[in-house]
């Protein structure tokens, strides 16, 4: 969930509609790609698709957009050996929860610490920010249908396969 893996460039070319040199600063997620491409193809996406079309953002016609993104990584143990984690990123802050065989939280101020080297989670000066991010994180997990019980289900399923 660190910036080096979270921020991925995307290049699009559609001269009929997209002006050259457009740069988007809004929080776009990979789950927005399919709805956007379907939108350009004039196809209505299925209700099950979680993402949003960012076509209006590319065309500079949309002012309101999400103020946070939810992220989850659950492929542990695996090749990368990165612990399971989920979190939320806003324009300024990032809250990450590592779970499964650990229970660790990280909080970063991306404006003051863009390299994410100073974990502020235990800093009492950031309790109100932490509380606000926890609330938003809970809302987004509910919105996307993620939960601790779902995590436990997948973990137990994985462990049973490994033990057989």
PLM features: what roles do these ranges have?
Residues 5-8, 51, 65, 82-83, ...:
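A structure-centric signal for secondary-structure junctions around beta-strands
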Residues 67-72:
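WW-domain-binding short linear motifs
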């Amino acid at each position: 969930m660190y910036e080096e893996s979270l921020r991925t460039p995307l290049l699009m070319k559609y001269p009929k509609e997209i002006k050259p040199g457009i740069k988007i600063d809004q929080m776009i997620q990979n789950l927005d790609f399919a709805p956007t491409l379907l939108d350009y193809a004039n196809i209505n996406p299925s209700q099950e698709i979680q993402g949003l079309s960012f076509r209006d953002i590319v065309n500079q016609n949309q002012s309101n957009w999400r103020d946070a993104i939810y992220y989850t990584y659950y492929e542990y143990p695996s090749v990368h050996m990165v612990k399971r984690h989920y979190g939320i990123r806003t324009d300024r802050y990032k809250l990450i929860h590592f779970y499964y065989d650990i229970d660790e939280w990280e909080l970063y101020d991306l404006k003051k610490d863009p390299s994410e080297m100073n974990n502020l989670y235990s800093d009492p000066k950031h309790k109100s920010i932490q509380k606000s991010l926890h609330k938003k994180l809970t809302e987004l997990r509910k919105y996307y249908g993620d939960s601790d019980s779902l995590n436990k289900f997948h973990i137990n399923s994985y462990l049973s396969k490994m033990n057989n």
